Design a protein with these regions (language model features):
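Conserved catalytic core of the tyrosine transesterase superfamily
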Residues: 1-184
Length: 184
């Protein structure tokens, strides 16, 4: 990093992360990379002091990260990586405000990129069978656990629906369970 006020504050922040927050080495290395890149971006735009950074500049930086590539195959950055970079920059700006270096957090209105939630991977038939057969039926808790697993798999209820079931919801003669689903 250059010897600007901004780069000195970034180094102070990294020391703070090491001493005060005790971050793991890999996390600290990621923060260091992200901050170096951020300071270089700001310096290239003539910004040398934290007080010169505004929300538009932060958004421009995040857009530049989103548009860039990395690695030997020039892969684009994933949304999760862009989100992690923003998290590091946000922590830096919170530090700057906390230390009284700036009065306003330039990241406060910057929206985190939406990270897609991965779809769950369904269990195979053999995995479900082994799971249902796992409880020890010789114990009351084993019988309970087996019943829970049978209802979860056989009926397809949500956990919240299952935990809301009462004995009155069971009709053993008719062979059904009354479940009040989401939304009543």
């Amino acid at each position: 990093m250059s010897d600007s006020e901004l780069s000195r504050d970034a180094e102070r922040f990294l020391i703070h992360l090491t001493v005060e927050r005790g971050l793991a080495a890999n996390t600290l290395a990621a923060y260091r990379r992200d901050l170096h890149r951020y300071v270089a971006f700001l310096t290239s735009r003539g910004i040398a002091r934290p007080a010169q950074v505004d929300e538009i500049t932060v958004r421009s930086f995040i857009a530049s990260v989103s548009a860039s590539t990395h690695g030997p195959d020039d892969a684009p950055y994933k949304t999760t990586s862009v989100s992690r970079v923003l998290s590091a920059i946000r922590s830096f700006h919170h530090f700057l405000v906390g230390e009284g270096i700036v009065a306003h957090d330039a990241t406060s209105e910057v929206v985190r990129p939406r990270v897609p939630r991965p779809l769950p991977h369904p269990l195979g038939v053999d995995e479900v069978r082994r799971l249902i057969e796992a409880p020890d039926l010789g114990t009351p808790s084993g019988l309970r656990d087996r019943a829970i697993l049978e209802v979860l798999y056989g009926v397809g209820v949500r956990i919240s629906e299952l935990t809301g079931l009462d004995v009155d919801d069971l009709d053993l003669d008719g062979g059904f369970v009354r479940v009040v689903g989401k939304g009543g």
